[in-house]
């Protein structure tokens, strides 16, 4: 996911063998929507919808995928400064997974404490727990690995303890143009949560390695 992933794109790639597809990332509340506007102004592609339209848009995208691929799970990657808008998205009828964005590294998102800066929140467990306890679908949390000052394994265990269904790891390692496979293996060995590995997956060889 680099900026935007929509139903049109996902419907093209699902036939290659994917059983889960992720839409997003979407900004849901006033602060994240404003941050997205700033990102767009400097030339990066971002989804941008008014706060009162975004849930309907996501629902339409979900339905476009389900119409062509009814057996594929659909996930929506979303960001918000508070849990409530994420819980609202989870109520979308055919959405299978709502994914909390704790991985975005755009400066405008970081400035409001979202994206990977979510990992620094003292109330992260409560935030995720609120979504897990009130969501109408499965919950995934996508994190960025190797963030300065953050113990990724500790965060992984925290997320597992909230009851989230999936841990999606952007296994980035600064200065290395490949996934941090050692860290992924360490997390998988020390947790029981379902782990989705990600980063630099651009070949069949890397898919098999991951």
Predicted regions and their residues:
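Active-site-adjacent beta->alpha loops and helix N-cap segments on the catalytic face
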Residues: 32-35, 58-59, 84, 106-136, ...
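Short, ordered loop/turn segments at secondary-structure junctions
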Residues: 26, 103-105, 171-172
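Catalytic cores of RNA-modifying enzymes
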Residues: 155, 159-177
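Hydrophobic faces of well-ordered beta-strands that scaffold small-molecule active sites
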Residues: 1, 19-24, 74-78, 98-100, ...
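Surface-exposed amphipathic alpha-helices with a cationic face
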Residues: 14, 59-70, 90, 128-139, ...
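Catalytic cores of alpha/beta
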Residues: 6-15, 83-94, 147-161, 190, ...
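A contiguous, low-structure linker/loop signature
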Residues: 88-107
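N-terminal capping/small domains of soluble enzymes
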Residues: 1-84
């Amino acid at each position: 996911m680099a900026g935007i992933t929509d139903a049109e794109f996902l419907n093209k790639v699902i036939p290659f063998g994917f059983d889960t597809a992720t839409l997003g990332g979407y900004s849901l509340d006033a602060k994240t929507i404003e941050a997205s506007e700033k990102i767009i102004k400097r030339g990066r592609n971002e989804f941008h919808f008014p706060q009162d339209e975004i849930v309907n848009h996501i629902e339409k995208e979900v339905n476009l995928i389900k119409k062509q691929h009814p057996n594929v799970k659909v996930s929506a990657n979303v960001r918000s400064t508070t849990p409530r808008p994420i819980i609202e998205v989870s109520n979308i009828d055919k959405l299978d997974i709502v994914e909390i964005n704790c991985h975005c590294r755009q400066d405008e998102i970081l400035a409001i404490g979202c994206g990977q800066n979510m990992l620094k929140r003292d109330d992260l467990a409560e935030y995720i727990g609120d979504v897990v306890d009130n969501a109408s679908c499965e919950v995934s949390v996508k994190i960025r690995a190797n963030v300065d000052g953050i113990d990724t394994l500790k965060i992984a265990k925290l997320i597992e303890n909230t009851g989230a269904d999936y841990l999606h790891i952007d296994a980035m390692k600064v200065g290395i143009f490949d996934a941090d496979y050692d860290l992924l293996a360490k997390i998988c060995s020390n947790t029981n949560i379902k782990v989705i590995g990600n980063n630099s997956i651009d070949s069949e060889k890397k898919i098999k390695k991951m």
